[in-house]
Curated annotation (Swiss-Prot):
Region ranges (Type E motif): 493-570
Similarity-based family: Belongs to the PPR family. PCMP-E subfamily.
InterPro entries named in the record: E_motif (IPR046848), Pentatricopeptide_rpt (IPR002885), PPR_At4g14850-like_plant (IPR046960), TPR-like_helical_dom_sf (IPR011990)
Name of this chain's protein: Putative pentatricopeptide repeat-containing protein At5g47460
Length: 576
């Protein structure tokens, strides 16, 4: 049964022992104590020679096989467990679930769970925590509620996993109910882990008073407790309170300092962020990256490149995230020499093949109009995930190359382990819209997205369709799309249609759309609406209306955004 795996072990190990000189009585202690490949090989040979193990050896076999990443062997052991009726052994089934959970195969773990006649609290906790740790918070919560209704009594680990999911989903009512249950069961008092989870949950749900109350009532606090309360203050804009806790903290660590830096950056206070960074005993790359990210997110790309230079002069060792962040800044500025320099730096550090860096390089080169460089990055990558495929399709879309975008999309559909997602179709529909691909082709992709891939259209998907219809003079059909997909009250959809009317210089249709936007209340501070209508009236030489619109803009305080350009020198980027 396991002969091929056994042969694989033979090539990896030169252990002299053979199956004939071993028995399960000697193998099991060796597996439990050492868990080496040689011992594992001997165990596999025993099975192949007809020595059937009971549940205890199988538990150790699964653990050791999982530790070495022998997925195929673990799956074969699962088959052996099922075939020989060991499914009812709770401990063994829990070991199988643990393996599948650590192998990111939650569906398989859930199948094992469903086959168990009497799952215990460890079984439930393994699955609940698995869903939460993999970001599937709703499924984790549903399973926790199912546990609560079952005959199995949840323990502190059940509750902390559920609290983590509540925090991410902002389910404060459920979180408060769990808190009450913990108090009733006496699991809150004296339990640092439970207290930390409660602080995190209340902080992420925006209930700072409750977070502080939990913190103050904790009999014992560790570093995680202090970091949780500082992070909660920072997350909710309570910077002064966060600083107060920071100064009370016995031994702030890197996480504490990074939380403060992040809080100052998000509030736009870069000076204090720098101060915290300079006060840090041992800042790591994450500390610097937080400020770098802040600049990029604040659309201060020039400052981001300057700060990146400062990082280099300060001797900071760049990681893949440092490079991907600064590449986003370079892409926004379209400064090719900087991009080439960072690409060379990434190559020197051996990081250019990392997915996060490679996708950022593809994005940067495509935004700079250097599609050949982007293509070279894409095709030379040893492994490509969906993000990279989407980035390349987006690059073609951005540069108006509908033929290559569609060709790459068709290649993606042939990939065995990948399938297009909402972002793939967003890029595909965008390139179809801008390149005047026949409407029936575009509608075909739209229907494929809904029917074949079960993706619900977002307003962004519909906007591409709306623009294409509007640019072809099919304003009535575009309005139908807006209403049919439930975006009649979404200003973004009407904005897209207004842009299409503007491209066709269709003043009559534009006036109808503008009236709808005003009705929705999206016009008060929307410079786009006023500028489009002003330009359309000017095109049709309706100067009186142009004057009226500009007067309304002045009275409403709507200002046209001032444009700027960038010049890059050898050391920095300057704007004018």
């Amino acid at each position: 049964m396991l002969r091929t795996v056994s042969n694989a072990f033979t090539t990896r190990s030169h252990v002299g022992s053979t199956a004939s000189s071993n028995s399960w009585s000697t193998i099991v202690p060796a597996l439990a104590r050492f868990g080496s490949i040689g011992v594992l090989r001997a165990a596999v040979e025993l099975i192949n020679d007809g020595e059937k193990p009971d549940a205890s050896p199988l538990v150790h076999l699964l653990r050791v096989s999982g530790n070495y990443g022998y997925v195929s062997l673990c799956r074969q052991l699962h088959g052996y467990v099922t075939k020989h009726g060991f499914v009812s052994n709770t401990r063994l089934s829990n070991s199988l679930m643990r393996f599948y959970k650590t192998s990111d195969s939650l569906e398989d773990a859930h199948k094992v769970f469903d086959e168990m006649p009497d799952p215990d609290v460890i079984s439930w906790n393994s699955l609940v925590s698995g869903y939460v740790q993999s970001g599937r918070f709703q499924e984790g919560i549903c399973l926790f509620l199912e546990l609560h209704r079952s005959d199995v009594f949840p323990n502190e680990f059940s509750f902390t996993a559920a609290l983590a999911a509540c925090a991410r989903l902002h389910l404060s009512p459920l979180g408060a109910c769990i808190h009450s249950k913990l108090v009733k069961l006496g699991l809150e008092k004296g339990n640092v882990v439970v207290g930390n989870c409660l602080i995190d949950m209340y902080g992420k749900c925006g209930f700072m008073d409750d977070a502080v109350l939990v913190f103050q009532h904790m009999e014992e606090k560790d570093t995680v407790s202090w970091n949780a309360i500082v992070a909660s203050c920072s997350r909710n804009g309570k910077l002064e309170l966060g600083l107060w806790f920071f100064h009370q903290m016995p031994n702030p660590d890197t996480v504490t300092y990074n939380e403060l830096i992040d809080a100052f950056v998000k509030s736009g206070d870069f000076n204090n962020a720098f101060q915290v960074l300079s006060d840090m005993p041992n800042p790591n790359s994450s500390s610097w990256n937080t400020i770098l990210t802040g600049y990029v997110n604040s659309e201060k790309s020039g400052e981001a490149t300057e700060f990146f230079t400062k990082m280099h002069s300060s001797g900071v060792r760049f990681d893949e995230y440092s490079l991907s962040i600064v590449l986003a800044a370079v892409a926004a500025l379209a400064v090719v020499p900087w991009g080439s320099l960072i690409h060379a730096c990434a190559h020197k550090l051996g990081l250019d093949s990392r997915v996060v860096v490679a996708s950022a390089l593809i994005d940067m080169y495509s935004k700079c109009g250097m599609l050949k460089h982007a293509e070279l990055m894409f095709w030379t990558m040893p492994r490509k995930n969906l993000i990279v495929w989407n980035e390349m399709i987006s690059g073609y879309a951005r540069n108006g190359d509908s033929i290559e975008a569609i060709k790459l999309f068709n290649q993606l559909k042939q990939e065995r382990f990948l399938k297009p997602d909402r972002f793939t179709f967003l890029n595909l529909l965008a390139v179809c819209s801008h390149c005047e691909v026949p409407m029936e082709v575009m509608l075909g992709y739209f229907e494929m997205m809904i029917n074949e891939y079960r993706i619900k259209p977002s307003v962004e998907h519909c906007c591409s369709l709306i623009r294409a219809m509007g640019q072809r003079g099919e304003v009535w059909q575009a309005k139908q799309v807006i209403q049919e997909f439930g975006f009649g009250y979404d200003g973004v959809a009407w904005r897209a249609l207004l842009g299409a009317c503007s491209a066709r210089k269709d003043l009559k249709a534009a006036k109808t759309v503008a009236a709808k936007m005003i009705e929705l209340g999206d016009a008060d501070k929307d410079e786009y609406l006023y500028i489009v209508m002003s330009n359309l009236y000017a095109y049709h030489e309706r100067w009186r209306e142009v004057g009226q619109i500009r007067k309304i803009m002045r009275e409403s305080g709507v200002l046209k955004e001032v444009g700027s350009s960038w010049i890059d020198s050898r050391t920095k980027c300057s704007s004018y």
